[in-house]
Amino acid sequence: MLVPIEWLNDYIDIDVSDEEFCDRMIMSGSNLETCEHFCEEMERVVVGKIEKIEKHPDADKLVVCQINIGEEEPIQIVTGAPNVFEGALVPVALHKSRIPGPLHGQPKQEGGVKITKGKLRGVESFGMLCSAGELGFDDKVVPVAHKDGIWILEEEYPLGQDFAEALQLKQAVVDFEITPNRPDCLAMVGMAREASATFKKPFSYPDTAIQKEDGEGESKDYVSVEIKNPESCKRYVARVITDVKVEQSPWWLQKRLMYAGMRPINNIVDITNFVMLEYGQPLHAFDINQVKGGKIIVENAKDGEMFTTLDGTERTLTDDMLLIKDAERGIAIAGVMGGLNSEIEEDTKTIIVESANFAGSSVRTTSKKLGLRTEASARFEKGIDPNLCEAAADRVCRLIELTGAGKVCKGSVDNYPVPEEAKTIDIRVDRINRVLGIELERQEMVDILKSLEIKVAGSGNIMTVTPPTIRQDLLEEEDYIEEVARIYGYDKMPVTLPKGNTEAGIPEDRALRDLTRDSLCGMGLNEIQTYSFVSPKGVDYIRTAEGSWERNFVKLINPLGEENSVMRTVLMPNMMEVLARNYTRNIDKVNAFEIGNTFVNNTQEDDVLPYEQYALCIGMYGKDEDFYSLKGVVEELFRVLGIKDPIFAGEADLGAFHPGRCARISVISGENGEPVQLGVMGEVHPDVAEQYGMEGVRIYCCELMFDAIRDNSDRTILYTPLPKYPSTSRDIALLVEENLEVGRIEALIRKEGGRILENVKLFDVYRGKQVEEGKKSVAFTLTYRDKDKTLTDEDVAKVHNKVLEALEHKLNAVLREM
């Protein structure tokens, strides 16, 4: 936000140096970027008048001008400017003068550019006629009338007077960085309020008192306003101006816009921009002859609707974009830019002034989709107080009246369905002092809060505070504590050291996550991090069932757009996006994982906190990867985390995964012996892969819940002496049904093997010519050992045969010859 000090003085008397002003504003919490002093490098540049113009004898594109600078004799200057004419008042850089620059087509020089007399194609020139750019103004703020050529003055000034003095060009402009939570400071009035509190001086609001409403009729006679989407348009105020004269703005108005970073266009547009900078409330003016039927209708555009904006670009709209329409067509994209079909022209005689409030989320979505960001959209995106609309509209009318640009009709058309009200809360004097570590009297706090236009009631320790509706950031007691702290002065806070003992240590949850990261990175996986704000369409892409908990989203109040409008409930959609992004960049193998928060709104109530927990998602693809690659990673991770005897139970359909190639992962709880689900894993469903542009690619994913892992993790290391007695192994190959899970076979073997069965290891799964259809062969190595003696063949055979009998009778497993 560019704040010219001269302009700020209209609202508050700044009687300190520019340096002190900046220092004190910083100490009261304002983030200051730069303080630039304009035209400090300008010397010996005066106001001159072109008395006579002659053609250059030796150059078609040059002319020789005789310039009256208030002395006895005119001076001669040769120029190639196309817009000079006899009688024009212009800035004249004399011999040995200095201008800020840069000269046309040259880079800017530190310390400015020195101008001396010389000859141009044989004709003497005793100085230079200057453009606005050569006097230090950026091209983007140069008035349209002076964009090409020499700066032609519209008003009379004494000839020979110092140019910077005549036009009051030497002044300071402070650039403040405005944080997203303080949209009220994107306005001169907002910065005046901050300065008032900082310097303990009163400030005044702009004059909005219209002296004569002498336009023909009333505003309601010309226009009606209908809001069809009150969620996206909270208020719409329209005022009508007749007998409009579209012309250049007076210099004082142009100058303020230029120093604030905006290009002057014409008096009507300039006044609306001026008031936007004053109040932070964007405004727009329509030519009433182009508003069909005298109707203003605020509603969403139709999907695919075409609309041409003021910049001449035809744009395709979608049905989530808010449009201002008349009785027949769209005339403006709400909060972003007006339409070419209702633009103010030189012959416009009657206008409608729009002062409306559009929802930040709606404007942000529209602006982002169209790739069109304007001063108006930047303000609406951050949130604007609907109560500004009327004052801003009246201020426009007052300036039109003051500049003679038109006649104001009586009244306004104000559609305000649900008036905005401030939130009143109680704050405590003792808590403010306790948090800040100071001892302020109650009255000091009251004075500070009132200087920010916060109403204070109550008595004793309790202060009942009501902020102005423009301060949408003041919601909790802590917000008011911050206000007291910054206006009191951070530099006045006593420096103290923390007291008490601090116990070092890492919480168990974090230690578990850190161990998981180390383990997975050690296995060659790469960690990724993605946004918690996601699109609700993500769960559709992974084939999540309707009504499932994964669809219980936490919705953002002020999202960046639909693709970032909810908090994620699962990590898999984000993982799929990352895998797809790598795949499209010809990365032939990816093994990745993410550990992040998920948020589930189980109650669907806005005032109840969502269930939040950490989750782990593993994703991989590549020619060497398969289901068992992923399972091996998960099993090794469980070993490190102390998850004993995990169960991988095959599932026919888990939505996101390939039917028959996925499993639920669980573990038997030590508390009640019931299975506890840890997560799911498997090969990603082909339809899901296709959604992400990976058609035909075999992708493997796993998602685990950290709460369940933490509750069932036992990383206690118990001492076990090295075995004294040897082990013996038996290999078995079993012919079983195709759909029989290996986990069930292993569980039965462990159960029947008893205490001497030390280990069971699967080493082969075979399907082929020697195995009949519908069957598979699975082979295990069984290791036996007794800690108290050396096992005999009879000891082993007794237990081993018991295992085989159980497999045959309970699972119909047939022993194959090895």
Residue spans of the language-model regions?
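Glycine/proline-enriched, intrinsically flexible loops and inter-domain linkers
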Residues: 5, 23, 63, 203-306
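Phosphate-backbone binding interfaces of nucleic-acid-interacting proteins
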Residues: 1-216, 352, 371, 375, ...
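Short, hydrophobic beta-strand segments
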Residues: 2-8, 170-179, 234-242, 375-383, ...
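Mobile "lid/hinge" segments at catalytic clefts and subdomain interfaces of large enzymes
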Residues: 121-130, 134-136, 164-165, 172, ...
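A carboxyl-terminal module marker
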Residues: 434, 451-457, 477, 539, ...
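Terminal amphipathic helices with adjacent charged low-complexity linkers/tails
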Residues: 199-227, 404-432, 438-439
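Conserved mixed alpha/beta core segments that line enzyme active sites in large multi-domain catalysts
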Residues: 47-77, 159, 255, 266, ...
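Extended, well-folded interaction surfaces typified by the phenylalanyl-tRNA synthetase beta subunit core
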Residues: 425-429, 433-589, 783-785, 791, ...
